[in-house]
């Protein structure tokens, strides 16, 4: 009897990682499906990879001297991320000053993080937003946040073009951050508008953290 109990215990313990992985996969699938549904609602061309729970799309920015936007959505077991980067790499000589500027701006942002990432030995400026979501209780608020924060991320990257250009023209991170502070002014109260914004996304109540220069 003791041997049988021991064997059953070993089998039960062996199944725990398998069950945990299955639960994680189901949670990721739920959040991936949410992302897919919301993005399909605005009729955007996208590439979806169900195996990695990732969705990719390209988007033309109003200001594209640094390239257009590469947007990547990733679904995890308890969160989704929205990552927007420029399609053109940064000049490596600018990287230290851009990182310094981004670090200063990040300390003031309401949501998300500006960063410089390295891929295939080239550097890209990016902005990432992390959204915590309960995969077993996805609310309308969670769904609305997908498009609302995608629009916010795109607006942020449009605004950053001018500041990165100033750095490319020889301004220091300190001076460019001072420009950003002067531009941002007082935080505006969010307003609900009818119709769709310039990205084609339905408008939502989102924090306005950047003002166009």
Please describe what each predicted stretch is.
Residues 163-193:
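Short, highly charged C-terminal tails/helix-capping segments
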Residues 192-208:
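Positively charged N-terminal leader segments that act as targeting/secretion signals
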Residues 8-16:
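Bacterial N-terminal signal peptides
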Residues 1-4:
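Positively charged n-region of N-terminal signal peptides that target proteins for export
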Residues 133-150:
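A short acidic/glycine-rich loop-to-helix N-cap element
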Residues 18-24:
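Sec-dependent signal peptide cleavage junction
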Residues 83-128, 132, 167:
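Short, internal acidic amphipathic alpha-helical interface segments
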Residues 33, 37-91:
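Ser/Thr-rich, low-complexity intrinsically disordered terminal regions
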